[in-house]
Amino acid sequence: MNDAIHVQGLNKTFSHKSALVDLALSIQPGEMVALIGASGSGKSTLLRHLAGLACCDRSNGGQVQVLGREVQSSGRLNSQVRRLRADIGYIFQQFNLVNRLSVLDNVLLGCLGRMPRWRGSLALFNREEKQRAMAALDRVGLADLATQRASTLSGGQQQRVAIARALTQRAEVILADEPIASLDPESARRVMEILADINRSDGKTVVVTLHQVDYAVRYCPRAVALKGGRIHFDGLAQDLSKQFLNDLYGADADASLMITERSRRVRQKPRLELAKV
């Protein structure tokens, strides 16, 4: 079986400062993986390289493959990277919605990677695409807000719209960059439950960067910890120890980063019953 994600010897430097150092990582199809680490550890930088939104160093830059296809190698993006991105759903921390558009129109933007540019530029979505977008909104519990402007939604609702957009895109790999960083606990729980359900029910590969270790343990079987652009842990999330986390986060290893005993004892199963799109 081919890896869903394969990274080999990835290096990235910003102004002579190493952000990623000879990084190697393989993720199997259908895995749900948490990337953890302090701010500046390289989590978001790695995610952007997986999606072809950033380019590695030209000298000894390394290689990134997604779904068996090369995204970039030695500082050069694949010339067909736009087509590759159709299979990679990217969920941003700040939602990346168009505030003036309706919720439904934002979700329909997920169709753009699989339709002719002329039709996309004219926003000519067919009936099947609109039905798919509505089904995605129904799955995340927002179908009744389809005609509402995106700017009127709460942060948690906007993040669910972003997830619905990835579902409409029919992405095989979903990359979520700090999707719950700015959300209240209840909204964060719901977003993580939706992502976990997509992974479990649809078999999608999900990679999520998280600052909250307890969420990583609760929802992600596997955790990869980064520090200084290097991988310092790759294994079962439940095996993360408090001593390791203290070393990983240093002065930032406060109570909000520590694993709760409840999370350690049992990974909570998502409580939402979500229909497939």
Swiss-Prot record:
It is found in: Cell inner membrane. Keywords: ATP-binding, Cell inner membrane, Cell membrane, Membrane, Nucleotide-binding, Phosphonate transport, Translocase, Transport. GO terms for molecular function: ABC-type phosphonate transporter activity; ATP binding; ATP hydrolysis activity. SUPFAM superfamilies: P-loop containing nucleoside triphosphate hydrolases. ATP binds at G37, A38, S39, G40, S41, G42, K43, S44. It is an enzyme of class 7 (translocase). InterPro entries: AAA+_ATPase, ABC_transporter-like_ATP-bd, ABC_transporter-like_CS, ABC_transpr_PhnC, MetN_ABC_transporter-like, P-loop_NTPase. It catalyses: phosphonate(out) + ATP + H2O = phosphonate(in) + ADP + phosphate + H(+). It is a peripheral membrane protein. Its EC number is 7.3.2.2. It comes from the Bacteria. Part of the ABC transporter complex PhnCDE involved in phosphonates import. Responsible for energy coupling to the transport system. Belongs to the ABC transporter superfamily. Phosphonates importer (TC 3.A.1.9.1) family. The complex is composed of two ATP-binding proteins (PhnC), two transmembrane proteins (PhnE) and a solute-binding protein (PhnD). This is Phosphonates import ATP-binding protein PhnC 2. It comes from Pseudomonas savastanoi pv. phaseolicola (strain 1448A / Race 6) (Pseudomonas syringae pv. phaseolicola (strain 1448A / Race 6)).
